[in-house]
């Protein structure tokens, strides 16, 4: 690390929609500042997971410190990378809190998109210096002037200092570095001498335990200090080492001082001990007040995860435990189901978070799993005045005890070309949405603001939006309040027995169509038996939809050659009684494929 000068430090972040070139620009900045040698360079260097590279998204934020010579001075540039997806908006807000500036990357051909819009507003709330960067300027479809106008009119940013660049060719990269130094303010020197450091991320290392990523706001942190976390109060830990991101995490001598970004290790073993947004201070000279903005991360979407082969239960438990080491937002609780056996009820930040965890389980641990339909947290107000919060149909109380139910709603911004307006309005109406306002983004695109129930978003909203807009629509959402809703428990009965794995909480208006579609799907995937199998959807014991799997026909009179009809009648009568007995005592074996198909449909 170079000699410390707070006026030569620049802490900045990169804000971009998925696939607008954030990771590629980060690669070019690392190359231009010689932070990494050419022979060690690879694409999307800061995206360490294979999944991040394949999907072209940032899941886990990765900071890096670069040094750059400008006008005879050496500057320390700290890039605090952020995940772009709406599921991780709290992590984004904490990463932005560690910065004084941000690069807003916009695709010069596609223009402003919903998720970059959401993160820009977070940056504006924190009063960060935002530098607009128009990427992919080398594309034939690039319209830099039109996109600048869009940014000015819709976001309200001055684009006179906007930089046209191409991460692919390297054009404009030196200008970006110079703009960071000229426009992003250095950290403000603090009058306080007590240590205050903001935790913006953490990482589990099997050798040293939890590495806590911090931006020092005041004071300094060094090896040997005894520190504590201000939200948990009580526990204290000795700092065993401090480090910087060069670009890999590297232990350094000395201390991390006000304005600097780095990490420390303190023999921490559980990621739950380290909360993003918390304030670190010393035990000897503690800070009087913690930094603002800390809140506990709470899961929003829940689903049950079960191994297809019950003997894989311990492997699944181990897999989830390991994933949780680097993901404090993932919650795990053991549960059992009559149909699926032993498994886990898991909480996620959103649908992308859920998909990533599922994919990592099957990929990194080679496990075949079944996941139940995603659910949200419903609020149940009982007649005796008590309030319950439930995320699982099995926890649904007796309907006679319920006063009313409430469901979480979200504020949604949708950006779409004008020609798809009617399609989107139909989709949102089908999803019980309320239109708040419609704004023009430019000559061809609109921004629609809606309120929608979260339950409608977590099912298939993204897929349907992409479908009705031919892939051009994008959206982001933020949580709103709970509102009363006619939420009921839909049960599926197979041969008059309830199968808990197919039960779900739905809005009354959608119960019949949902029940019918599940019954129709089950008729296709459950093999016929020697007796008729009724498949029914029920609400509070009342059947609302029914399908029947016809019995396999067995010719019991095949051995009778002509002769008296009474002999045949006796055999048919005997078969009839046998089928009746089988229906009463026979068990319908539901293949795993049936669970997979129905839950995929949900």
Curated annotation (Swiss-Prot):
HAMAP family: LepA. Signal peptide: none annotated. GTP binds at residues 19-24, 135-138. It comes from Chlamydia muridarum (strain MoPn / Nigg). The lineage of its organism: Bacteria, Pseudomonadati, Chlamydiota, Chlamydiia, Chlamydiales. InterPro entries: EF-4, EFG_III/V, EFG_V-like, EFTu-like_2, LepA_C_sf, LepA_CTD, LepA_IV, P-loop_NTPase. Required for accurate and efficient protein synthesis under certain stress conditions. May act as a fidelity factor of the translation reaction, by catalyzing a one-codon backward translocation of tRNAs on improperly translocated ribosomes. Back-translocation proceeds from a post-translocation (POST) complex to a pre-translocation (PRE) complex, thus giving elongation factor G a second chance to translocate the tRNAs correctly. Binds to ribosomes in a GTP-dependent manner. It is found in: Cell inner membrane. This is Elongation factor 4. The gene is lepA. GO terms for biological process: positive regulation of translation.
């Amino acid at each position: 690390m170079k000699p410390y000068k707070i006026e030569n430090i620049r802490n900045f972040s990169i804000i971009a929609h998925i696939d607008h070139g954030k990771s590629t620009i980060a690669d070019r900045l690392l190359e231009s500042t010689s932070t990494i040698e050419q022979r060690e360079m690879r694409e999307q260097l800061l995206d360490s997971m294979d999944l991040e590279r394949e999907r072209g998204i940032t899941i886990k934020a990765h900071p890096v410190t670069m040094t750059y010579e400008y006008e005879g001075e050496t500057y320390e540039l700290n890039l605090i990378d952020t995940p772009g997806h709406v599921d991780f908006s709290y992590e984004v807000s904490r990463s932005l809190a560690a910065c004084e500036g941000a690069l807003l990357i916009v695709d010069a051909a596609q223009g402003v998109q919903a998720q970059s819009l959401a993160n820009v507003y977070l940056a504006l709330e924190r009063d960060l210096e935002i530098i607009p960067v128009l990427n992919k300027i080398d594309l034939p479809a690039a319209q830099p002037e039109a996109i600048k106008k869009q940014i000015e009119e819709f976001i309200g940013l001055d684009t006179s200092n906007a930089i046209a660049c191409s991460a692919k060719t390297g054009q404009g990269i030196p200008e970006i570095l110079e703009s960071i130094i000229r426009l992003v303010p250095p950290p403000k020197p603090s009058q306080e001498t007590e240590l205050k450091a903001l935790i913006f991320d953490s990482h589990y290392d099997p050798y040293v335990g939890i590495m806590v990523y911090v931006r020092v706001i005041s004071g300094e942190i060094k090896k040997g200090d005894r520190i504590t976390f201000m939200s948990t109060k009580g526990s204290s830990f000795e700092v065993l080492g401090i480090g910087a991101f060069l670009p890999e995490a590297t232990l350094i001598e000395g201390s991390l001082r006000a304005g600097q970004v780095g990490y420390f290790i303190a023999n921490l073993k559980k990621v739950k001990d380290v909360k993003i947004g918390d304030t670190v201070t010393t035990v000897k000279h503690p800070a009087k007040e913690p930094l603002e903005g800390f809140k506990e991360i709470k899961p929003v979407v829940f689903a049950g995860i079960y191994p297809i082969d019950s003997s894989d239960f311990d492997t699944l438990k181990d897999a989830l435990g390991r994933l949780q080491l680097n993901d404090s937002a993932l919650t795990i609780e053991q549960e059992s189901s009559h149909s699926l056996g032993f498994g886990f009820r898991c909480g996620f930040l959103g649908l992308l978070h859920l998909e990533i965890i599922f994919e990592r389980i099957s990929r990194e641990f080679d496990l075949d799993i079944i996941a139940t339909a995603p659910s949200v947290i419903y609020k149940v107000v009982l007649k005796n005045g008590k309030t319950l919060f439930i995320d699982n149909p099995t926890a649904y109380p007796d309907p006679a005890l319920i006063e009313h139910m409430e469901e979480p709603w979200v504020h949604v911004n949708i950006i779409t070309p004008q020609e798809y307006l009617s399609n989107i309005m139909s989709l949102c109406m089908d999803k019980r949405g309320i239109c708040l306002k419609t704004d023009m983004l430019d000559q061809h695109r609109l921004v629609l603001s809606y309120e929608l129930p979260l339950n409608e978003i977590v099912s298939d909203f993204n897929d349907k939006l992409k479908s009705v807009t031919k892939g051009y629509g994008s959206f982001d959402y933020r949580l709103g309040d709970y509102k009363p809703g006619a939420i009921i428990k839909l049960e599926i009965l197979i041969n008059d027995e309830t199968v808990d794995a197919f039960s779900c909480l739905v809005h009354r208006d959608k119960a019949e169509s949902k029940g019918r579609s599940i019954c129709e799907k089950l008729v296709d995937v459950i093999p016929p038996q020697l007796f008729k199998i009724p498949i029914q959807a029920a609400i509070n014991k009342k059947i609302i939809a029914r399908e029947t799997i016809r019995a396999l026909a067995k010719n019991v009179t095949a051995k009778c050659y002509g002769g008296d009809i009474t002999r045949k009648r006796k055999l048919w009568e005997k078969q009839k009684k046998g089928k009746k007995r089988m229906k009463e005592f026979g068990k319908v074996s539901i293949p795993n494929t049936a669970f997979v198909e129905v839950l995929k449909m949900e």
